[in-house]
């Protein structure tokens, strides 16, 4: 009975002992991140690195509106299709927008040679000057410049022709050889366009140009071609059996271009002095224009984000995040979020970094919870918390800065005869995209793993700091907690927290209390040993008595014969 009383007193004393615990912050966050080793780890704080939203609108890019081609495409705009007259005043733009089903291109049927390369060149042009390269009235005095019209390029119900080209025909049954030149004095590249007409019959050739064996020659420092009309009847397109092929070249500053022909020349009328801007580009989109401003435009809509990655569209104009195929890129900045189970007791699961964090500690990431005669409370360790915040903030900013190389990414242009090259290009682009995506995801996984390990290390360091101060003045009771062998008031608790705990001051009291507890343990151990021996002997006697009674009963009823020999 005495032993039982001592054990009970020991337990009550332990329950009233002053206690300090080391733990970490927890909250109601549902943010999850992935690491190299784990998926969907719930954390207290994290930052998103992946933009996945847009406004669905076409916007001004840094205050400059785009050039919307509407129902026209690049060819119709540059050649001057009469249906594209509204685009003639265009001089500058932030980017160019085509619709997927633009119907007004080259109105007279034929091939636009190297059209995809021209589109590629225009993707870096932000403005141009449209000027008369060969004035209509004075450049071709011996040729007709007004009869070259066609129903294929009608306007307002009447036959017409391109606004930037002249269809030269014979004048008074004569088409003398022409030769005209232009010297580029604009100080910038000049885009020059022209065409060659291929009649459907010799009769048409003679009707238009008089000469049967016609040619067209175009020469500059970087361009030299001679064209011969191909006379043949072809299937009707836009009610035309003839064809026109369209050509272009870029004339460098100071260079000269010379046109020579005795028939079939579709001569330049207007040309374009180009000004390049690396932020421009061409996108194909059905989105509508709105009164909004952005730094990044995609075919699906504008992105207003400073994040380093986006998964909206690979084609972008302006200062845009890098496109990746990832569905989630979230970087942890806080800790594992494992709130303690309150019902298990204040100094059970709640009190340590092993089983859970503290929702009650809101002013820091790591800290202490104490309990003594004066009460209980939380206190954050501001120094370790601030050092961790600074380190993680610098790391996140560094990652975003290194990966946040914002740029324009436009699609490459291929014609119908370059399908193999286009397919190869797609494979190469897909390969680069896969590498970018893999690098981004791996970077986030590794950094998340390092951050969570960093937090675990900080909590462990805080625990070891307390342990090294208390030494044998307290005992570890698990879950990050220490139970003092002495009374520890609030001043004492503060000294433990700030690293000024006076071990010698409390060592004598701790020694006495420790010896009392150890003595109770030893005495109770002796009693338990006596009880164990007594229990064993008593059990054996009961077993022997039971066995004797059974044997006597069996002998008395004849079930067991007993013989005693002397």
From Swiss-Prot:
UniProt main location, coarse: virion
A Pfam entry, by short name: Hemagglutinin
Entry superkingdom: Viruses
Biological-process GO terms, alphabetical: clathrin-dependent endocytosis of virus by host cell; fusion of virus membrane with host endosome membrane; fusion of virus membrane with host plasma membrane; viral budding from plasma membrane; virion attachment to host cell
Topological domains annotated Extracellular: 18-529
Signal peptide residues on this chain, from the entry's feature table: 1-17
Keywords attached to this entry: Clathrin- and caveolin-independent endocytosis of virus by host, Clathrin-mediated endocytosis of virus by host, Disulfide bond, Fusion of virus membrane with host endosomal membrane, Fusion of virus membrane with host membrane, Glycoprotein, Hemagglutinin, Host cell membrane, Host membrane, Host-virus interaction, Lipoprotein, Membrane, Palmitate, Signal, Transmembrane, Transmembrane helix, Viral attachment to host cell, Viral envelope protein, Viral penetration into host cytoplasm, Virion, Virus endocytosis by host, Virus entry into host cell
Keyword Metal-binding among record annotations: no
Subcellular location: Virion membrane; Host apical cell membrane
UniProt topology in membrane: Single-pass type I membrane protein
Record site: Cleavage: 344-345
Positions of S-palmitoyl cysteine lipidation: 555, 562, 565
Note: Major glycoprotein, comprises over 80% of the envelope proteins present in virus particle.
Subunit composition and interactions: Homotrimer of disulfide-linked HA1-HA2. Interacts with human CACNA1C.
Name of the molecule in the record: Hemagglutinin
Native source species: Influenza A virus (strain A/USA:Phila/1935 H1N1)
